[in-house]
C-alpha cells in the first residue's frame, strides 16, 4: 500500500499553491436512499465484514479483480468496517467525499478519502453539500494526436493511497476533459496523472506495476493541474522521477511518444512553449520558454499558466522512428525487455496509536 506520508506527488511539490474557491454543488441523494436501491449489495457487505462498491452516480469501479472490489484502493485492501474507502469518478470529475477532519496533507488522514464504512457495514456520506462525484473546472483537455493507439492518463488517488488507479482513456484522434480541481477540493490539492504510451491499456496502465514495462508508475511522463481563485489554471508536464532512477532498466531509453501543452488562445497562456519531444529532447530534457525546472526526484518539468478561465491542452503525439538524438535508442512501449525486474508489492499495514 502506498502511504501519502511516504509518496508525495512529485508535481504537488512544484505546482503553484492557490487560495480558496467556493462552488455550489447540485443536491445529492441521501445515503439512505442510495442504500435502499442497493439492498442486496448492502446485506452482502455486512455479512462479509466489508462494504461493497455501491455504483452511486458518477462513480467508476477500478481494478475489480483484487480484494479492493472496485474501490480506488490497493488490490490487497478491502473496504472494511471502520475504514475510509476512496473511489474513482468519470473523466473530468472529482471525488466529492472525504474525512472532514482531514484538512492537511499529513499521514494518516491524507488517506481518508471517499465514503466511510462504519461498524455496521453502512456507507456514510460525510460531505452532504457535495455530490459523490462533481465536475472539475474543465480547463484542461487531454488530446491524443498519436496514430499508434489509445492513451491512458492515470490519475492518483488523493486523499487516498496515491496509486495511479483513476482512468481516463483518450482514443486515437480524440480528446477527453481532465479533472482540474479548484481550491474547494481536498486540502486545495491538485490532480496528478501518469501519462502512458499509446497502445497501453487502462487495465495495464492504471495500476502499480513493475520495471518489466514503462507503464503505470514506471511511465515516462507525469502531468498535473489545478485552478486558483483568480481563474488561473496551472498545467504541468514533466519526466517521471521513477523512470530516471538508477535501477530503472529504461532510464536511458527515449520514449516513442512526446507530450506538450498548447492553448486555444495563446494570448491567455504564459509559459509556452512547454514540451517534451524525444526527437529533439534527450531523457529528462524539456523545451520551455523559462528553461524548465527540476522537481523532487530530479525530474525536469515545465508549467503553463492559462489565465481568465482559458483552456489548455495536454497533447500526446508520436515521435518519428528515425529519432536518435544524443545517441539514446527509442523505446517501443510494447517491447519485451529482458532484464532484472523490480516489482512493487502491496502490503496493507494497520497502525495502532498508543494512548
Swiss-Prot record:
Keyword Cell membrane assigned: no
Swiss-Prot/TrEMBL keywords: Membrane, Transmembrane, Transmembrane helix
Positions in coiled-coil regions: none
Topological category with respect to the lipid bilayer: Single-pass membrane protein
Location within or outside the cell: Membrane
A GO term from the CC aspect: fungal-type vacuole
Keyword Zinc-finger included in the entry's annotation: no
InterPro entries assigned: Beta-glucosidase/SUN-like, SUN
Principal cellular location given in the protein's record: membrane
Positions of transmembrane segments: 6-26
Family under the similarity heading: Belongs to the SUN family.
Protein name, entry field: Uncharacterized protein YMR244W
Organism: Saccharomyces cerevisiae (strain ATCC 204508 / S288c)
Highest classification ranks of the organism: Eukaryota, Fungi, Dikarya, Ascomycota, Saccharomycotina
